[in-house]
From Swiss-Prot:
<keyword id="KW-0547">Nucleotide-binding</keyword>
<comment type="function">
    <text>Tubulin is the major constituent of microtubules, a cylinder consisting of laterally associated linear protofilaments composed of alpha- and beta-tubulin heterodimers. Microtubules grow by the addition of GTP-tubulin dimers to the microtubule end, where a stabilizing cap forms. Below the cap, tubulin dimers are in GDP-bound state, owing to GTPase activity of alpha-tubulin.</text>
</comment>
<keyword id="KW-0378">Hydrolase</keyword>
<comment type="subunit">
    <text>Dimer of alpha and beta chains. A typical microtubule is a hollow water-filled tube with an outer diameter of 25 nm and an inner diameter of 15 nM. Alpha-beta heterodimers associate head-to-tail to form protofilaments running lengthwise along the microtubule wall with the beta-tubulin subunit facing the microtubule plus end conferring a structural polarity. Microtubules usually have 13 protofilaments but different protofilament numbers can be found in some organisms and specialized cells.</text>
</comment>
<keyword id="KW-0206">Cytoskeleton</keyword>
<dbReference type="GO" id="GO:0007017">
    <property type="term" value="P:microtubule-based process"/>
</dbReference>
<dbReference type="GO" id="GO:0005525">
    <property type="term" value="F:GTP binding"/>
</dbReference>
<keyword id="KW-0493">Microtubule</keyword>
<dbReference type="GO" id="GO:0005737">
    <property type="term" value="C:cytoplasm"/>
</dbReference>
<keyword id="KW-0963">Cytoplasm</keyword>
<comment type="similarity">
    <text>Belongs to the tubulin family.</text>
</comment>
<dbReference type="GO" id="GO:0005874">
    <property type="term" value="C:microtubule"/>
</dbReference>
<feature type="active site">
    <location>
        <position position="40"/>
    </location>
</feature>
<feature type="binding site">
    <location>
        <position position="28"/>
    </location>
    <ligand>
        <name>GTP</name>
    </ligand>
</feature>
<dbReference type="GO" id="GO:0016787">
    <property type="term" value="F:hydrolase activity"/>
</dbReference>
<protein>
    <recommendedName>
        <fullName>Tubulin alpha chain</fullName>
        <ecNumber>3.6.5.-</ecNumber>
    </recommendedName>
</protein>
<dbReference type="InterPro" id="IPR000217">
    <property type="entry name" value="Tubulin"/>
</dbReference>
Length: 50
C-alpha cells in the first residue's frame, strides 16, 4: 500500500487560484463521468507485467 498526502498540493492550488474557501469543483481538474459503460473500463486499464 502506498500513502500519498495531497494536502501540500491542495494548499498550492488554493493559493494559485486565490480562493478563500475552495470547494471540490474548484480543485477538480477533470470532469468525471457519472455513467460509465463497462466496456470503457478495458480501455482505461494499464497492464502490469508480472
Amino acid at each position: 500500500a502506498i500513502f500519498v498526502d495531497l494536502e501540500p498540493t491542495v494548499i498550492d492550488e488554493v493559493r494559485s487560484l486565490d480562493i478563500e474557501r475552495p470547494t471540490y469543483t474548484n480543485l477538480n481538474r477533470f470532469d468525471g463521468a457519472i455513467n460509465v459503460d463497462v466496456t470503457e473500463f478495458q480501455t482505461n486499464l494499464v497492464p502490469y507485467p508480472r
